[in-house]
């Protein structure tokens, strides 16, 4: 049995949490319904969590990943119609004032087939190798730097339009797109 030990009231009333990431004494979370804020809360005292900051952004993230000590990567949608995939980088160096420092929108005339919206294992997010990969009709592989933002390294057409089961993995210096029965090299 789980017991509630602390609560933060009166935030994002009527909205749903779409993504959350717990890192040390902080939790970062995204809600969605009318507005799409990123919230930062201090959970160092579990019985008295405190909301520290929030930032309203367009779109919403389905996945959050701590990129480095001061940045959180978000992957989701750039609009409420879910017609654009959005990569976003948040600067959370000041938890009371999170800032969206970069974003990249991917548009498609087709509806999206994205396993990452319900399976976080479908995302390759590796700050050390500077790789961000996921399926969204095709397999996309990006890098990130603070000056240039997100850079598309590779867009690989998928053999099957059902994106389930495709994984970006790396071995040594090769990035592979893996699916049964055999992997394909997409970046060396």
Can you say where each PLM-predicted feature lies in the sequence?
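Loop/turn-rich, solvent-exposed surfaces of beta-rich toroidal or solenoidal domains
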Residues: 74, 84, 115-145
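Structural signature of eukaryotic scaffold interfaces centered on beta-propeller domains
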Residues: 19-21, 65-66, 117-128, 168-171
